[in-house]
Amino acid sequence: MFFKLFTIFFFFIILLSKPLNSSSQSLNFTYNSFHRPPTNISIQGIATVTSNGILKLTDKTVISTGHAFYTEPIRFKDSPNDTVSSFSTTFVIGIYSGIPTISGHGMAFFIAPNPVLSSAMASQYLGLFSSTNNGNDTNHILAVEFDTIMNPEFDDTNDNHVGININSLTSVKSSLVGYWDEINQFNNLTLISRKRMQVWVDYDDRTNQIDVTMAPFGEVKPRKALVSVVRDLSSVFLQDMYLGFSAATGYVLSEHFVFGWSFMVKGKTAPPLTLSKVPKFPRVGPTSLQRFYKNRMPLFSLLLIPVLFVVSLIFLVRFIVRRRRKFAEEFEDWETEFGKNRLRFKDLYYATKGFKDKDLLGSGGFGRVYRGVMPTTKKEIAVKRVSNESRQGLKEFVAEIVSIGRMSHRNLVPLLGYCRRRDELLLVYDYMPNGSLDKYLYDCPEVTLDWKQRFNVIIGVASGLFYLHEEWEQVVIHRDIKASNVLLDAEYNGRLGDFGLARLCDHGSDPQTTRVVGTWGYLAPDHVRTGRATTATDVFAFGVLLLEVACGRRPIEIEIESDESVLLVDSVFGFWIEGNILDATDPNLGSVYDQREVETVLKLGLLCSHSDPQVRPTMRQVLQYLRGDATLPDLSPLDFRGSGKMLGMNHRFSESCTFSSGSSIAYSIVSGGR
């Protein structure tokens, strides 16, 4: 019985004396080289083992990492809460850089809790950490970095340093690469010198001091360490840890090597390496292509440079010729007198960024309008490109455009100048930021104008048209008054624009026009019959515009049910006959508006759109009616159908002046001629 108890007690004592960790351990190991396949060495990433026994952590792959681990865990603590035991390691390293003075980041020796660094990044992170875990205490990593790039974000001192790092790429302490000799003199070393260097890393569990020492390969270990720091590693190390090397590349081609390695825990120093067995630095030289560039490129360059010069000259000449053709303009002697009003096509091309569709403001039967910014003055402009297939009357047309450009009125869009190129004419206007009036009237507009704004636009256009007819030095017949040619400035003031069809004549005379031009729905019947444009034909178009603004409808609309054209003038006239003319008002106005002003505008619109030009008021009279300086004749629908005297004579119409709204618009014609 006593013997059995003694046996059990003895077996229990043996169990207690065994390590708690059942994993295999290695208290020391030595690799004088790494012959394939190396025992207990795991390589990851782009790391390889060369045929001559060198651990090659990286190749010439950019932005990559390479790792090498000792596969067995090393027990650094007797228990999880115990202190870290003393350990010592020595290894031989070397770095090759494709450019002798610049490297693609460095390498490191590390002790980590796991045999893989899955989240580690390349470049400045050295394959140790990432942008998300750098500096975290949960990393539990001790590293000795051999860095060849200065990264200010990690407080690096230079681009050739050794540092002791704990859980971070910011070194606890670092030093310029070198060693102290026997006479205590510091000697510099260069990591990318393509030479082997031996490193010793020692930790003393009594003093908690970490020493890193370096020397050229073949030299004895210096007595004085290169970098020393006192740090208790108990909170950094777990009970079992893994050893290894890491390296990373950037955009500069570089390779990192480990030639030999020994390690010991719970001992004074690591086993010494047998230096004669440590592999030599690999012969890394230029490739055949690099040798070609070095030896043959000078001769090749002598032959290539003249060829490149000739080819470049040909392309340059072609570029200049094409550029000149691209910006070529037509210029005749008679245009000399208009020189200051003529703008360069090149400036307009760059102002509109090549007349791209994204800067297209609108298009119509007479051209397309683009927004632009003049390169030098930064002035915003609108450029209208008008087809000019016929050269007949071109000189007179340009002369009129230049004359119109001299006009100045707050309700006219300033015409800044013109440009003539090939078969087109370009007219340049001030840019109006709020666009044309039509987009605020039709098709459920996103932004609607209240009556006060609309009435202000009407007054503005009437003022501008009165200036054209009576106040300027010559009479200007606009010939294309419509909602899309009324532009709104930043304060929503109405400005009459687009003088591409305008004609000039002296006061007291009529312009000699023989062609009908204008836009459907705005042409007066007398203009269609005779081809003559007068101030009265402008008044007719203005009358249609008045009805558009008040009703929010187009001059001509198609009925969905009957597929027939419905004339706005006929529709408003029908409401007037029924005695409820205000029912023609735009529903978007709501119920808050000046009914007297709206009724005046509607009746004045019908009066201006009368089929007899003699009955239509002048723009002077129109302004007086709108401003309240004169009273609109007391009109009724019967006055437009019955007998009476002419407007201005007892405010009646003659029997011969019948209101024929259908004929006034139904035969409107669009023509590109003059």
Swiss-Prot record:
Pfam family, any one: Lectin_legB
> Which pairs of positions does the record mark as disulfide bonds?
none
| EC code | 2.7.11.1
> What superkingdom heads the lineage?
Eukaryota
Cytoplasmic compartment ranges equal 318-674
Q: Which residues lie on this side of the membrane: Extracellular?
A: 23-296
Catalytic residues, chain numbering: 480 (proton acceptor)
Enzyme class, top EC level, equals: transferase
Q: Which segments carry the region annotation Legume-lectin like?
A: 26-263
- Give the UniProt family note: In the C-terminal section; belongs to the protein kinase superfamily. Ser/Thr protein kinase family.
Which GO molecular function annotation, any one, does this entry have? protein serine/threonine kinase activity
Protein's UniProt name: L-type lectin-domain containing receptor kinase IV.3
Tell me where in or outside the cell this protein is found: Cell membrane
Q: In which residues is ATP bound?
A: 361-369, 384
Which stretches are transmembrane? Answer: 297-317
* Residues carrying covalently attached carbohydrate according to the record: 21, 28, 40, 81, 136, 188
Q: What is this enzyme's catalytic activity, as reactions?
A: L-seryl-[protein] + ATP = O-phospho-L-seryl-[protein] + ADP + H(+); L-threonyl-[protein] + ATP = O-phospho-L-threonyl-[protein] + ADP + H(+)
How does it sit in the bilayer?
Single-pass type I membrane protein
| Signal peptide segment | 1-22
Give residue ranges for domain Protein kinase.
355-632
Of the GO CC terms on this record, one is:
cytosol
Keywords, sorted A to Z: ATP-binding, Cell membrane, Glycoprotein, Kinase, Lectin, Membrane, Nucleotide-binding, Receptor, Serine/threonine-protein kinase, Signal, Transferase, Transmembrane, Transmembrane helix
Xref: Gene3D superfamilies: 2.60.120.200, Phosphorylase Kinase, domain 1, Transferase(Phosphotransferase) domain 1
